[in-house]
């Protein structure tokens, strides 16, 4: 009986620690095709995800920014949940910053409505680890995922 009590206590502590290692926050925002530069950002623990954009064409679209941290690694997702986006992005930039260190070391994954776009094709990673459109950018975005390295 005593062994079962200790086992139950250990399991409870394990669950509490495991749940505290992963956190998430999200925010819905509306992109208006007015061509004006706008910015949305989220902050969670030691991370800040920033998405700046200017879009034209189509109609207003609801997009979502989602930031999660787990075991010291952060992931930021920015995109339109459904359906595909009909906006034409004149420009965009995205960055995931560790606010504690001031560093931004990310692994980006960006998709247009046709699929994943290779780094260097339609977007580039600047020297300060900000994702921006390249000269070849066709104006279409479906989602962006920024993963921090540990």
UniProtKB/Swiss-Prot annotation:
A cellular component annotation (GO) from this entry: extracellular space
Leader peptide range in chain numbering: 1-22
Alphabetically sorted, this entry's keywords are: Secreted, Signal
Species name: Dictyostelium discoideum (Social amoeba)
Task: Please give the name of this protein.
Answer: Myeloid-derived growth factor homolog
As for subcellular location, the record says: Secreted
Q: Which family does it belong to?
A: Belongs to the MYDGF family.
Family matches, as InterPro entries: MYDGF
